[in-house]
């Protein structure tokens, strides 16, 4: 047996360079590159290996471990999970910073390889710098926290353990049914230890993603159920995009006159203008999709996890005869809602169903309902696009909260812009193939409802974990995946303040991204939630502390985000009017460096709910009558929802 004497870290780098993916007959390198933030826990081990011979891995320098790992996830998401990035951090706080990103990747079923440095396997220098000492178990380190949020976790305590660990890591990273974050912990001493690795460990390895076919029995059962139903609706989930099954879903919809709603992950698989595309569905869905869904007697989920936002906490589907068919590569997700399970690749399942249903000449009984719902929503969309602040008689979309002090925001922020009008202008002015990236706050709701996707795969929303701070890093990841397209981070001031470190990395790499920063001086989405459930405005507006009351109810804070970003070298713009917005968007396209448009918008001017409900933990006992009323409303809505 031929062997190669290498350090553990050198062997890892060599192994990663030999991993390939094959999908529908096309092969490509699976691991494009690696994000790094070096510290004592990885610099002389994995860092040395990368310096000596990184192979074809592109080595990127992150600014924050969570930020770079979010960028890695976004890269894989935009690549439809066919190519990924790895990330390495030092021990302790560096690795802990990636835990949130691991959770984000796993919640979204997006493959990311995390390589955190770890404490010494020998324990000779214990406690090493940045080590936590647990008196009940000395084998525990910070990295054990990754166990709860990783789809596969391992620790390499001996060099030879690398081989079995990485084989299992690749199994999970390339498994569409159960992929997510894979964490391989690398004790800093073991990284530098040498071993005689067998040469076959470094052979080219091609991981073929097979398209799983539906079983005859599940296919027959699905056909039997569908043919009994008159008003079915489909839900287009992220699995449609990852399986590249958009054309088959279109064929299915057109052949049998079945409309479909989109989840956040599924949106832009098919252009918004398609006659059977109702748009976003659920809590952040629009009126067209939710109206049709309420009356549907069959829900066909395709590549969806059926989250509470998609099902409106399982209260959306009100037809007493409603049943579910779940097409999913994951048995776990297919098993939800007592559904008839079709555990298969989305494309193969749809093709098989098309053949069977065409043979019996099935058609839904819809006549004008679909077109009428879409037309009604288009009218509402035009209204949202044209909302302008009109002074004292102005009624914001979210009424009854700030009606008496909205003018305070007009004066403090120096703006009269409404959020829906800004989004309308952006949708008109951005290139058709531009990619928008979002994650948290009120923007995901506005975008799922309002954004018209004119080209496939241009809507990139992380809403599985809704991780604040994903947006800017996510834009960088999407840009690395599709460097020829303009990429826009749609981010609120709350999320931007949490994390925007990789904006600097975009400058360093000459990968232009555009940050569209909506500043309403607060956590506006959560303010809506608390006030909509009977509370006052508490801890969600960005106000100075009032010296008299000692509460955060002083003057509204105004932050010059443009000035801050300009210090990095970003091209910046300040916007308080529609005309300024139009000029800024046009000029930003001409730039070669990353841009930031600081857009001051009025609170409560985002979209509100459309025929949906969200189950949250309203207080059962309170001295507040409005909270009591909110609890009674919750109980009433819960009675209309499925129990599981």
From Swiss-Prot:
Annotated keywords: Hydrolase, Magnesium, Metal-binding, NAD, Plasmid, Thiamine pyrophosphate
Alphabetized SUPFAM superfamilies for the sequence: DHS-like NAD/FAD-binding domain, PH1570-like, Thiamin diphosphate-binding fold (THDP-binding)
Presence of keyword Magnesium: yes
Binding locations of Mg(2+): 493, 520
Binding residues annotated for thiamine diphosphate, in chain numbering: 65
Cofactor notes: Binds 1 Mg(2+) ion per subunit.
GO cellular component assignments: acetolactate synthase complex
PANTHER family: 3D-(3,5_4)-TRIHYDROXYCYCLOHEXANE-1,2-DIONE HYDROLASE (PTHR18968:SF9), THIAMINE PYROPHOSPHATE ENZYMES (PTHR18968)
Family matches, as HAMAP family: IolD
Function text: Involved in the cleavage of the C1-C2 bond of 3D-(3,5/4)-trihydroxycyclohexane-1,2-dione (THcHDO) to yield 5-deoxy-glucuronate (5DG).
Name by which UniProt lists this protein: 3D-(3,5/4)-trihydroxycyclohexane-1,2-dione hydrolase 2
Gene designation: iolD2
């Amino acid at each position: 047996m031929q062997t190669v004497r290498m350090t553990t870290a050198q062997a890892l780098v060599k192994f990663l360079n030999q991993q390939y993916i094959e999908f529908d007959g096309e092969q490509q390198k699976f691991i494009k590159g690696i994000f790094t933030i070096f510290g004592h826990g990885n610099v002389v081990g994995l860092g040395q290996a990368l310096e000596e011979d990184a192979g074809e891995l592109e080595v990127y320098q992150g600014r924050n471990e969570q930020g770079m790992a979010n960028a890695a996830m976004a890269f894989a998401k935009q690549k439809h999970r066919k190519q990924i990035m790895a990330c390495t951090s030092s021990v302790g706080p560096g690795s802990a910073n990636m835990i949130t990103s691991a959770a984000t990747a796993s919640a979204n079923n997006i493959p990311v390889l995390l390589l955190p440095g770890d404490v010494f396997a020998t324990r000779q220098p214990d406690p090493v710098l940045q080590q936590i000492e647990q008196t009940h178990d000395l084998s525990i380190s910070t990295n054990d926290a990754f166990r709860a949020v990783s789809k596969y976790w391992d620790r390499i305590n001996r060099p030879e353990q690398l081989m079995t660990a990485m084989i299992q890591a690749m199994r999970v990273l390339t498994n569409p049914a159960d992929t997510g974050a894979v964490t391989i912990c690398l004790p800093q001493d073991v990284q530098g230890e040498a071993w005689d690795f067998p040469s076959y460990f470094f052979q080219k390895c091609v991981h073929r993603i097979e398209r799983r076919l539906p079983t005859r029995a599940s296919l027959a059962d699905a056909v039997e159920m569908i043919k009994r139903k008159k008003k079915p609706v489909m839900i287009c989930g992220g699995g449609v995009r990852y399986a590249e099954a958009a054309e088959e879903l279109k064929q299915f919809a057109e052949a049998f006159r079945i409309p479909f709603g989109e989840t956040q992950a599924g949106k832009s698989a098919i252009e918004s203008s398609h006659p059977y595309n109702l748009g976003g569905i659920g809590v952040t869905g629009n009126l067209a999709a939710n109206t049709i869904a309420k009356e549907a007697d069959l829900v066909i989920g395709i590549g969806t996890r059926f989250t509470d936002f998609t099902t409106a906490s399982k209260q959306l589907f009100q037809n007493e005869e409603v049943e579910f068919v779940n097409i999913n590569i994951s048995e776990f997700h297919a098993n939800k809602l007592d559904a008839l399970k079709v555990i298969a690749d989305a494309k193969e399942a749809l093709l098989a169903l098309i053949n069977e249903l065409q043979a019996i000449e099935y058609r839904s009984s819809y006549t004008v309902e679909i077109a009428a719902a879409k037309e009604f929503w288009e009218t509402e969309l035009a209204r949202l696009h044209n909302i302008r602040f009109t002074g004292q008689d102005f009624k914001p979309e979210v009424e009854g909260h700030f009606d008496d002090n909205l003018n305070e925001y007009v004066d403090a922020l120096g703006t009269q812009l409404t959020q829906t009008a800004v989004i309308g202008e952006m949708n008109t002015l951005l290139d058709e193939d531009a990619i928008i990236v979002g994650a948290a706050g009120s923007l995901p709701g506005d975008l799922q409802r309002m954004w018209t996707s004119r080209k496939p795969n241009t809507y990139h929303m992380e809403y599985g974990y809704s991780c604040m701070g994903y947006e800017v890093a996510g834009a960088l990841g999407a840009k690395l995946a599709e460097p020829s397209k303009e990429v826009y981070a749609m981010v609120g001031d709350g999320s931007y303040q949490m994390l925007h470190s990789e904006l600097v990395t975009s400058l360093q790499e000459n990968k232009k991204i555009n940050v569209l920063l909506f500043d309403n001086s607060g956590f506006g989405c959560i303010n809506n939630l608390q006030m909509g459930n009977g509370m006052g405005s508490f801890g969600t507006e960005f106000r100075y502390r009032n010296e008299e009351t000692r509460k955060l109810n002083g003057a509204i804070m105004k932050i010059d985000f443009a000035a801050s970003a300009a210090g990095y070298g970003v091209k910046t713009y300040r916007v308080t009017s529609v005309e300024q917005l139009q000029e800024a968007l046009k000029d930003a396209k001409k730039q070669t460096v990353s841009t930031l448009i600081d857009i001051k918008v009025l609170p409560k001017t985002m979209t509100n709910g459309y025929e949906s409900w969200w189950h949250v933990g309203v207080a059962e006992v309170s001295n507040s009558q409005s909270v009591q009323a909110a609890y009674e409303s919750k109980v009433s809505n819960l009675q209309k929802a499925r129990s599981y």
